[in-house]
């Protein structure tokens, strides 16, 4: 068996080819070293000592337990346990449901997560910042500050109940575009369908990713990568012009300053020089306006950044352009991803 590092590096190298389809992934789950690495990754994280629906925690870990788990994976008798549902308070005072998987399921999910991250990290767009290595809400804000200069309108996107409404069939279809291993796909589907236990009652799951599941964030990014790529193509079609034309007022003031400056260089009379300097400073104050025409219809741009299920679009264009963009995104999300853009919470604001 190859070391986990070599396995993951190999997957990462292949991911750089956008049309590559991964095969024989399921065999990676026979590698005990992958599970040991997974164990090391999750053992110190808060919450992993919390018992799942099977009552076990990571302190009961052993190589024998890993071998038993691999055996169940080999003959595909492995079945994830339903997560134990609990509730945690949100900032607004409401409660958010959280599923606590069994530890064996955490272990398998962590192996899958490492594999998916290696396969997709290079494939993701630079505009995606949530749940990714070396990225955070801070890198998203930095990108907004850097790229959204001169933006006139903002479209703040809100997807209704995103994590609960991820369509399983759509997600599996997206995964199959890059993964040609049916057993690996079946395993992920098992996690999607595992359900949860609340008040000792089992509930099936028909949509959404495993709540509290280790693979949920990466699956969410794979799902919304479709939106990221759609917006990249949309911007390429929308963007117009090389640069904005100069503001006529700014140009006129600049001309006056140049003319007065030329006179100043030729004048030796101190009184006249002082008058010219005063006039130049006065015009310089008037010239504290945008140097370009902000209403230039021949120059348009879109900038887009996403963090998890929140996204923002900066528009250099008209309000009508922003409304069209919002409507196009709404239709794309519904038609392609079976998601609903919140009319109430998706705002268009002036910059």
Model-derived regions: residue spans:
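Non-catalytic terminal/accessory segments
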Residues: 1-351
